[in-house]
Every structure is written in C-alpha cells, then in structure tokens.
Amino acid sequence: MPTHVALLRGINLRPHKRVAMPALRALVEGLGHADVATYIASGNVVFTAGTAESTLADDLEKAIADELGVTCRVVTLSREELARVVADNPYPDEPDPKRVHAIFLTGTAGQAAQKRLTEVQDKLGEKVGRDEARILGRTLYLHTPDGFGRSELAKVLSRPGGPAEGTARNWATVTKLLAMCEPSGTVGS
C-alpha cells in the first residue's frame, strides 16, 4: 500500500478547532489505513492508504467533521509528491528551515494562482521586502528571510480565503514528514 501524508488546515490554533492526535490517529485507522503516525499537533498524518487515492482528502474531511466535530480542509500527498516538493525547493541555500515554507494548495494551482500571487506581490509593493514566493505544481514556496511572523506577504498568503488556498508548513516539518514516509522512518509509531 502506498504511503501518504495528510495535512489538516487550521486545527489546534483556536479553542473551537481542537483535535487530539490520538483521536486523529484512531480516526485515520478507522478509515482502513495502516501505519498511522502523527507529527506535532498541527495536523500532520503519515499513513499507508487502504482506499483510493482520489478520495483520501474528501474522506478525511468528512470523517473529521462527523466524528470529531471539526470542519477543516485536508490536503493529501503521496510520498512521491512530497519527495518532489522537497526536490523542487527553489530556496535550497537558506540555512534556517523555519525561513522557508511550503503552502500546499488545495486543487491545482495553475495560471490563476500564479496571477493572484503576482497581484498580491504588486499590491504589497515595498512591503514584500526580501520575501520571495514561487508556485511549482500544487505548492507555493515562500521564503521569509526576516521571519514568517514579520512577513507581510506571509500574512496575506496565509489568510483564509486568500490567494493561496491551502495549508502551510515550515521546511523543518516538510522534511520530517518525508523522512517519516521512508521505510526506516517512524511510520506506525
């Protein structure tokens, strides 16, 4: 069975969207998946899929809403897709993994997302500072050399309903999740 990663958007940030990781692991196992492991409490799940890949995100969203009472978007990636995201990082020279983020987009990015990104960057003008962003496939890469919390671009891109609909993870989390997908990783623990 292929290994996948599920990324939940916006959980455990506010009191009304709390999800306990043991409950999330049990839910994913209850959907017929195996080798389920979570990483930190921000909604990162690694598992081997027991059902069709095309329905993973929708099935997880529905089960989380029905069983845990939390409505959230879910982005799923195969191990191969996540490996491609890591390989395609346009900012490999940044030594601090917390200065590079991947925003995993829901759906396909395409020209419309690139156009929205350009519009946001143009609107912010000098407020963008040294920040950079690029879309490759279904991933928006965000480089914030002065810090994510200080980035005007990050604030706009991370806003629900903003130009980058998806869920963000810093590079340390992205690479840890890929390591968890490997045969010698911690899947199943």
Regions found by a protein language model. Name each.
Residues 2-189:
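Surface-exposed, charge/polar-rich loops and edge strands
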